[in-house]
Amino acid sequence: MRPLNVQIRLGNLRHNYQILKEMHGGKLLAVVKADAYGHGAVRCAFALADLADGFAVATIDEGIRLRESGITHPIVLLEGVFEASEYEAVEQYSLWPAVGNQWQLEALLIRHWKKPVKVWLKMDSGMHRTGFFPHDYASAYAALKQSEYVDSIVKFSHFSCADEPESGMTEIQMEAFDLGTEGLEGEESLANSAAILNVPEARRDWGRAGLALYGISPFGGSDDRLKPVMRLSTRIFGERVLQPHSPIGYGATFYTSKSTRVGLIACGYADGYPRRAPSNSPVAVDGKLTRVIGRVSMDMMTIELDASQEGLGHEVELWGDTVNINTVAEAAGTIPYELMCNIKRAKFTYIE
């Protein structure tokens, strides 16, 4: 069997949730969209079932999957519905929809709901993707407030640069949000992972923990308070010694500078490892750091082995404990979200 393995450490997931919840101080949604950032939404949700105040997803299908698996917690649809007919499923599965534009608002208001719905009303405080502009927010809020079909309203917005504290955008967005919601009663939600960790003023009634929930610092590098949940590993299944000035891999982009032990490992870009990862991207053999050499192929990669490192059959960590996923992502010119969400053709093992 091909030895590409993903370990999901559910104990680390629980640890991270508890740390973030304590820091936030209010209620905390565990964001499990995109199959929990590639970790497995159902397994992660059940691991957090006795801790979480609720969950957040991106699509109706993601919410339904949690409900049909037995999750009874609040589930927020962060993007709301994509067509008016989906409000039927919102009601059937007791989901909490975000409302971020006029047609979503109007479709919700003209529907005859059998039971009142809890709405998350989104403001565009400066990111300019979705949400009502601050000067339009109060009127959208009033329309919902007057409806007999609306149980309650959570006011929320999303930060564009919370992971870039020096930008000043988070403060600008908070000011816009506070001005646009002035005098409007109800709960609020502003803090994503970066704001939970770094912006106390954004910790309102509800937090939304995404990247940090999975043990990854949104600021790059590592955060000793968090424990990585995903560990991606494989094994060496081939080994050879190349003479100096030998090319390796497609495009002959890497040449050995000396006699070099080369390990062949079972992982490639078809498995989700980034093809853009350059030579010198870190990996670890039995806990000792080494590097990728040559281009990443579809199904395999080549790594450098020094004289002290074991070879054939030994484990190689691609990211997890010794190798920080932020380091891999930075080397490849991408972000850790993309790496985790892209993993496939691997055996998943869940560790309680």
Swiss-Prot record:
User: Which catalytic reaction applies to this protein?
Assistant: L-alanine = D-alanine
Query: Mind telling me which Pfam families this protein's record contains?
Result: Ala_racemase_C (PF00842), Ala_racemase_N (PF01168)
Q: Which residues carry this modification: N6-(pyridoxal phosphate)lysine?
A: K33
User: What does the entry list under GO cellular component?
Assistant: cytosol
Name the enzyme's class.
isomerase
Q: Where does the chain bind substrate?
A: R129, M298
GO process terms (BP): D-alanine biosynthetic process
Residue numbers annotated as active site? K33 (proton acceptor), Y250 (proton acceptor)
What pathway, per the record?
Amino-acid biosynthesis; D-alanine biosynthesis; D-alanine from L-alanine: step 1/1
The record's EC number reads 5.1.1.1
Secretion signal span: none
> Which key words tag this protein in UniProt?
Isomerase, Pyridoxal phosphate
User: What InterPro entries has UniProt attached to this entry?
Assistant: Ala_racemase, Ala_racemase/Decarboxylase_C, Ala_racemase_C, Ala_racemase_N, Ala_racemase_pyridoxalP-BS, PLP-binding_barrel
Look up the record and name the cofactor or cofactors this protein needs. pyridoxal 5'-phosphate
Molecular function terms, GO-annotated: alanine racemase activity; pyridoxal phosphate binding
Instruction: Explain the purpose of this protein.
Output: Catalyzes the interconversion of L-alanine and D-alanine. May also act on other amino acids.
Q: Which family does it belong to?
A: Belongs to the alanine racemase family.
What name is this protein filed under?
Alanine racemase
Gene label:
alr
